[in-house]
């Protein structure tokens, strides 16, 4: 049991080795909290596949940090005059971001979660950097060191690029939409991508609040209305719940 997503999202060979070794040793592998903390994301997907459903698309907001950032920066209801850099600073102060916000803004955390889901859906994704990932780190700031001084420089200079994010938000608003940072998997096309997309304001993704996650499973069985898993996708309490639930499953299997 582990909530650590790195082993399950690294090289495909490692993924195969983990499950091959588990099968050989008749061991159990549970990693529900690697995606969505305590939300039943992996178990829902595994159940769909195990019962013979055909998963065609998976789409959602997989980062509590990025959910908070865009729900605050570009709310679906009302308006916000907040600058992008100010929202990032607020999220950092509230503890929503990693100590270095670039670890959230580079999109790699979302990419790792998409890699795990894609593999469970039957796609042999080589690595989390094997598909398009849109980074929200301005190119001019990407090379700053990861030291405390580098983080300070990043936060100090981020306001220089507020206009870029404002233009993206304005472009969405002119179309009657909002911008969100999402991950999507097109299973038949074997296409995985992570980045910004525009959504209608009355869509489930646009209507998220706070730092909630939402994951939609489009399948042959569910048709046009996807199976949706939504709720808090980050935090110690919900992550601990996910790990504890895995532990209970192991205990039940061993009894």
Feature annotation, model-predicted:
Residues 30, 34, 38-55, 59-60, ...:
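NAD(P)-dependent dehydrogenase/reductase Rossmann-like domain
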Residues 4-48:
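Rossmann-fold NAD(P)-binding glycine/threonine-rich loop
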């Amino acid at each position: 049991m582990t909530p650590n997503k790195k082993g399950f999202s690294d090289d495909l060979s490692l993924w195969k080795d983990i499950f091959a070794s588990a099968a050989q040793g008749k061991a159990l592998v549970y990693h529900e909290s690697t995606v969505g903390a305590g939300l039943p994301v992996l178990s829902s997907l595994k159940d769909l596949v195990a019962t013979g459903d055909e998963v065609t698309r998976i789409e959602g907001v997989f980062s509590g940090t990025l959910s908070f950032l865009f729900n605050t920066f570009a709310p679906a209801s009302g308006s916000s005059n907040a600058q992008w850099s100010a929202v990032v600073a607020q999220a950092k102060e509230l503890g929503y971001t990693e100590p270095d916000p670039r670890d959230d803004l580079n999109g790699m955390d979302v990419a790792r979660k998409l890699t795990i889901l894609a593999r469970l859906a039957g796609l042999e994704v080589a690595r989390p950097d094997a598909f398009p990932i849109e980074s929200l780190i301005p190119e001019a700031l990407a090379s700053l060191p990861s030291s405390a001084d580098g983080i300070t420089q990043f936060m100090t200079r981020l306001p220089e690029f507020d206009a870029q994010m404002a233009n993206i938000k304005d472009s969405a608003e002119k179309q009657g939409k909002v911008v969100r940072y999402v991950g999507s998997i097109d299973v038949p096309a074997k296409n995985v991508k992570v980045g910004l997309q525009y959504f209608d304001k009355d869509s489930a993704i646009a209507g998220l609040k706070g730092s909630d996650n939402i994951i939609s499973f489009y399948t042959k069985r569910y048709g046009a209305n996807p199976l949706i898993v939504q709720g808090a996708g980050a935090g110690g309490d919900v992550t601990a719940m996910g790990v504890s639930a895995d532990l209970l499953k192991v205990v039940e299997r061993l009894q």
